[in-house]
């Protein structure tokens, strides 16, 4: 582990040089350390739109989420980890109170903290709709509904793999939504996510993609 003072020194150097910072945080201990770091960076060199992001976001407290909102932080989360790990973490390692509350995305949505999803491949599958399904349903691999109040709306889930994902990386003017002047890069689904059962979101088939305006149907491969 890098000593805290060294981390702060490096972070301050990149912060002052204009880089966007991304930090891996899996527990509330690392989240607390990152919150402290953001406060230091903002005190030394205030930035209204820094978009410092927490990557993974496995476990935080409600109070920490409120602090992230106040500090202007953003989140790149992996809700798949709740799907695959919540049960075993609850039973064997963290206890039900923490295991059930993994990846508190509902809290972020209520607070208005911007968030996106990532796969963390090869640790988890490259399946954006699986991430949406995990966040919207919060049903574990064993079929248990845990942390129901941390579910997110379908709209928030879809934004997390499109425009919000682009925004977190600073590419919202190029990709992430269909608009004149942006790159025509998007995926075409065979069913409307808003018209299927939430439990079926992960099963929606992919027709193909459009890359820079050129359609590429999967059937052609």
Residue ranges, per PLM feature:
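Extracellular/periplasmic ectodomains of large secreted or surface enzymes and adhesion receptors
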Residues: 219-221
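His/Asp/Glu-enriched, well-ordered alpha-helical/loop segment
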Residues: 12-22, 29-52, 56-57, 62-66, ...
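Ligand-binding beta-strand-loop-alpha-helix segment within the catalytic cores
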Residues: 74
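Active-site gating/metal-coordination segments in enzymes
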Residues: 1-6, 57
């Amino acid at each position: 582990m890098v000593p805290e003072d060294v981390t702060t020194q490096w972070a301050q150097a990149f912060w002052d040089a204009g880089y966007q910072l991304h930090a891996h945080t899996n527990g509330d201990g690392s989240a607390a350390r990152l919150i402290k770091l953001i406060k230091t960076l903002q005190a030394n060199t205030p930035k209204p739109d820094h978009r410092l992001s927490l990557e993974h976001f496995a476990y935080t407290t409600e109070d920490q989420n409120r602090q992230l909102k106040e500090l202007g932080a953003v989140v790149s989360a992996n809700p798949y980890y709740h799907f695959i790990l919540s049960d075993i973490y609850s039973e064997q390692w963290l206890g039900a109170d923490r295991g059930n509350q993994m990846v508190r995305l509902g809290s972020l949505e209520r607070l208005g903290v911007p968030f996106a999803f990532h796969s963390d491949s090869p640790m988890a599958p490259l399946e954006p709709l699986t991430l949406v399904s995990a966040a919207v349903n919060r049903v574990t691999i064993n079929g248990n509904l845990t942390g129901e109040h941390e579910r997110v709306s379908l709209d928030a889930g879809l934004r997390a793999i499109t425009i919000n994902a682009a925004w977190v990386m600073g590419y919202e003017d190029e990709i992430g939504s269909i608009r004149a002047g942006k790159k025509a890069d998007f995926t075409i689904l065979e069913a409307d996510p808003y018209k299927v059962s939430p439990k079926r979101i992960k099963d929606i088939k992919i027709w193909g993609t459009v890359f820079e305006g050129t359609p590429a149907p999967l059937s052609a491969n």
